[in-house]
């Protein structure tokens, strides 16, 4: 094993990587049983964080179970990614499936040359969603064999932890809520992004009502004050800048206009791509 990697290192995975892999698996070409690609992220003194990924086209040979990667494509996409996210580095590769493939050793050799910060990691994702669960395992290759003889690689499991920030949790809760219940007819009239803002505002209003009710009960001596709750409320209040209602209204409306403009532009681009795709299909026919 590389001296730069420790089995005790903490590896964290961003939820965005899951969505990118699942999306690539759903959009895979006909005839392909799996998708694979490059894992990107940061490695700081044993704290490894997988934050991004991109797929790499490959060709499967059924006669010998060999897989050939399009290395030229991988190098070009990696170079473009470095312009957008200069802090991200290659950490390894991912693959969909139930078990480590026979070509994992050859793919490992390629990513050994690409990884500048330690041993490449191998993320295996079972995108078939067996039992409605996304099975995920992380491996690291370990050299094994007789000294002076033939050596091989054994892929050993590495502990993996899902890293969720506050912004990630908001999106995940929204996805979970939409997956568990159908949108009502009243909410269908809203733009989806605005409906999420309305739900978040209602939830915040409910939480504020609970806090105000607790404070009023403490002031009226109906409840015994709790120092832990008081310190938490103080930290929450001091974390928010003090703004009057007029400034807050202007700031909120400005951000809302920016969001509506982004929604409009993204809708126009989506429509243009759909029209372009239909025109290209008509020309092929």
Curated annotation (Swiss-Prot):
<comment type="function">
    <text>Component of the eukaryotic translation initiation factor 3 (eIF-3) complex, which is involved in protein synthesis of a specialized repertoire of mRNAs and, together with other initiation factors, stimulates binding of mRNA and methionyl-tRNAi to the 40S ribosome. The eIF-3 complex specifically targets and initiates translation of a subset of mRNAs involved in cell proliferation.</text>
</comment>
<dbReference type="InterPro" id="IPR000555">
    <property type="entry name" value="JAMM/MPN+_dom"/>
</dbReference>
<dbReference type="GO" id="GO:0005852">
    <property type="term" value="C:eukaryotic translation initiation factor 3 complex"/>
</dbReference>
<dbReference type="GO" id="GO:0140492">
    <property type="term" value="F:metal-dependent deubiquitinase activity"/>
</dbReference>
<keyword id="KW-0396">Initiation factor</keyword>
<comment type="similarity">
    <text>Belongs to the eIF-3 subunit F family.</text>
</comment>
<feature type="domain" description="MPN">
    <location>
        <begin position="11"/>
        <end position="145"/>
    </location>
</feature>
<dbReference type="GO" id="GO:0031369">
    <property type="term" value="F:translation initiation factor binding"/>
</dbReference>
<keyword id="KW-0963">Cytoplasm</keyword>
<dbReference type="GO" id="GO:0016282">
    <property type="term" value="C:eukaryotic 43S preinitiation complex"/>
</dbReference>
<dbReference type="GO" id="GO:0006413">
    <property type="term" value="P:translational initiation"/>
</dbReference>
<keyword id="KW-0648">Protein biosynthesis</keyword>
<dbReference type="GO" id="GO:0071541">
    <property type="term" value="C:eukaryotic translation initiation factor 3 complex, eIF3m"/>
</dbReference>
<dbReference type="InterPro" id="IPR027531">
    <property type="entry name" value="eIF3f"/>
</dbReference>
<dbReference type="GO" id="GO:0001732">
    <property type="term" value="P:formation of cytoplasmic translation initiation complex"/>
</dbReference>
<dbReference type="Pfam" id="PF13012">
    <property type="entry name" value="MitMem_reg"/>
</dbReference>
<protein>
    <recommendedName>
        <fullName>Eukaryotic translation initiation factor 3 subunit F-2</fullName>
    </recommendedName>
</protein>
<dbReference type="InterPro" id="IPR037518">
    <property type="entry name" value="MPN"/>
</dbReference>
<dbReference type="GO" id="GO:0033290">
    <property type="term" value="C:eukaryotic 48S preinitiation complex"/>
</dbReference>
<dbReference type="InterPro" id="IPR024969">
    <property type="entry name" value="EIF3F/CSN6-like_C"/>
</dbReference>
<dbReference type="Pfam" id="PF01398">
    <property type="entry name" value="JAB"/>
</dbReference>
<comment type="subunit">
    <text>Component of the eukaryotic translation initiation factor 3 (eIF-3) complex. The eIF-3 complex interacts with pix.</text>
</comment>
<dbReference type="GO" id="GO:0003743">
    <property type="term" value="F:translation initiation factor activity"/>
</dbReference>
